[in-house]
């Protein structure tokens, strides 16, 4: 989708089941002598594979290369459920959604933005139509929105945040980890394995399961739903 905007996109590939390729990212940054790379984009927690990536490691790669590129992170399936240190990791834009850790229906995009990213916005030349921080900031200053807001979801978000703060984020993270670890132990007991290549990559919000050769994953999902009333998602992309 970035290429649809006419942007020059350099993709650092990694095998499915692995996290963001830190060495490849640092190599690309070091090779950019003219410092033309504007931003590094990464997904913190990949839903299709159940893999979390080392965002702090990407920040270290940027710092080691002395590169001024910004760091944009998709945190849709991790923020409010797993530790996410926006300031400590030097993230410039983080994107979350109402439908994951904030426990609401889909419909809200929740963004965090750094002063550096806001400053870059002032000189950005790419046309924006659907979303523009300038529109948002101008409307917020007047106590409103540049569109008709989803009032019900916004009210629900306020309640969700109250719940998260009442429980305490450390307790929220511990709860998700405990439940995820229980799921992973069950997966191993069934003779299957998580799709993530190693334990340090395990997500605490989604576990993608690798079924044995000859096992029909879709049939397994259907059996769990019909016999046990349990809902599992089918694979996405290359793990479908």
Protein language model features and the residues they cover:
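PLP-dependent aspartate aminotransferase-fold enzymes
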Residues: 1-30
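General beta-strand structural signal in soluble alpha/beta enzymes
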Residues: 11-12, 41-42, 71-75, 94-97, ...
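Short, small-residue-enriched loops and turns at beta-alpha junctions
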Residues: 16-19, 46-50, 79, 102, ...
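Active-site phosphate-binding strand-loop segment of PLP-dependent enzymes
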Residues: 20-78
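Active-site C-terminal subdomain of aminotransferase-like
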Residues: 99-185, 189
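Conserved C-terminal alpha-helix-loop-beta "cap" of PLP-dependent enzymes
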Residues: 188, 192-240
